Amino acid sequence: MIGIIGAMEEEVTILKNKLTQLSEISVAHVKFYTGILKDREVVITQSGIGKVNAAISTTLLINKFKPDIIINTGSAGALDESLNVGDVLISDDVKYHDADATAFGYEYGQVPQMPVAFQSSKPLIEKVSQVVQQQQLTAKVGLIVSGDSFIGSVEQRQKIKKAFPNAMAVEMEATAIAQTCYQFNVPFVVVRAVSDLANGEAEMSFEAFLEKAAVSSSQTVEALVSQL
């Protein structure tokens, strides 16, 4: 069983509509869609936006469906200036950009008693990298950071880049999903696409290009599923 998590309806609808033998179940107000995608059993959920929603949905998915792996799909804001709208983002590490327990000796972004970063499954990273090469898509593997704010100003962007110079993208759920997978020992990877450049024009760009990002990330996830 492959688990696929997206925060927003636009981020999961394309994949959900491709499921055969579709079945829907609701647990604690979270909807799960099971079915067959590319001859593989999958379960898709729309988690809702933000870290708490993401962690709850991931926990429910793992407990109810016992997935072998989890893929987080959707959109993100680019922090790497070489990235453009529609480019595919593949996580190697994910971190929180809004966690601060440095007063107790932890690194900025590290939750107490948790790793500094949550590492994606290397075999899954390799698989996704092969997929994007086959599809001739522009993609980047790197650090994705998460927090409970939509990054829509130059000041916010600069603050994150100062704390995490190597971060390529920012969004609101991936690290919470990764932490949950870490605690349940479920391999994961984040496969998202750029919807905006996390700057003063981010809100307008996000609204205009969310669909493009959703198509790009969904196509990549579908191709990945076919090779798992």
Swiss-Prot record:
GO terms for biological process: L-methionine salvage from methylthioadenosine; L-methionine salvage from S-adenosylmethionine; nucleoside catabolic process. Keywords: Amino-acid biosynthesis, Hydrolase, Methionine biosynthesis. Its EC number is 3.2.2.9. It is an enzyme of class 3 (hydrolase). InterPro entries: MTA_SAH_Nsdase, Nucleoside_phosphorylase_d, Nucleoside_phosphorylase_sf. One of its GO terms (cellular component) is cytosol. This is 5'-methylthioadenosine/S-adenosylhomocysteine nucleosidase. It comes from Staphylococcus aureus (strain MRSA252). The gene is mtnN.
